[in-house]
Amino acid sequence: MRPIIINGRFLLHRTTGVERYAREIIAELDKAIPAGSITMAVPPEIENVPVYQNIKVIKTGKFKNRLWEHISFPWYVHKQKGISLNLCNVAPLPSPGIVCIHDVKIKATPQYFSKKFRLWYEILFGNATKRAKKIITVSEFSKSEIVKYFKVDPDNITVI
């Protein structure tokens, strides 16, 4: 089985609902898995690296911010022959792996977002919904919206 590598870039952000979801899922995973079976990769600029009992955390890459997420992180996943687990809406363009899409408000209520923001997230979500090995989401409603706006097979989406 390929190793699972969590995208830890969310640790750079202030905690909102999306980041809290990621932290809670990871905390529960940590309790449920054998030691060393999952790794979390984080950007080098993270100062307070979380400590888990069973999840190994590793600083990797030379880039920062989005470049880390779309270059350094997927490169690390590739070198480890792993699969990425992306819990905060965004997955690397080169290899989305498993991605959690919390909502698709950019499609449902586009008037609330700038054109630039919508375009960026439409690219990210479009890539993830077409190429991800698995999509997870937070509710049946979000699942139905992903199916509606991105024409995803509902069997490829799991609600957690």
Task: Please report, for each region that a protein language model flagged, where it lies by residue.
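Carbohydrate transferase catalytic cores enriched for Leloir-type hexosyltransferases
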Residues: 1-160
